[in-house]
């Protein structure tokens, strides 16, 4: 049976926040942390951090580990945000194509 739900495939459903956007809104802005200060604390170039914040580059394992250590978060937390973003973007790009794939019966 094909799903009639457009919840996850409708491009206008919800704003899909990139990991860098969430890094700023949930971690940096609340404590007044600048990208320059955070980059220096992480031991990375500010341009690298800015590219992730701008959504121009994806979060990677190296940056995830540095951020997790700095913010005392679980390793993989920031990669999880990136994965959630990429999955939603892929669903939107497929735009209903997944509905045409019949799940294999057990």
Language-model features: locations:
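K/E-rich alpha-helical interaction surfaces of small helical-bundle regulatory domains
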Residues: 68-84
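Short alpha-helical DNA-recognition segment
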Residues: 32-51
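Short, charged recognition helix plus adjacent turn
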Residues: 79-106
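The DNA-recognition helices of helix-turn-helix-type DNA-binding domains
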Residues: 45, 56, 71, 85
């Amino acid at each position: 049976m094909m799903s009639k739900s457009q919840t996850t495939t409708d491009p206008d459903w919800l704003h899909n926040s990139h990991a860098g956007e969430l890094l700023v809104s949930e971690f940096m802005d609340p404590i007044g942390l600048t990208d320059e200060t955070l980059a220096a604390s992480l031991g990375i170039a500010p341009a690298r951090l800015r590219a992730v914040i701008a959504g121009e580059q994806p979060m990677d394992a190296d940056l995830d580990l540095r951020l997790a250590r700095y913010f005392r978060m679980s390793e993989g937390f920031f990669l999880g945000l990136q994965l959630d973003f990429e999955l939603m973007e892929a669903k939107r790009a497929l735009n209903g194509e997944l509905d045409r794939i019949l799940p294999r019966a057990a």
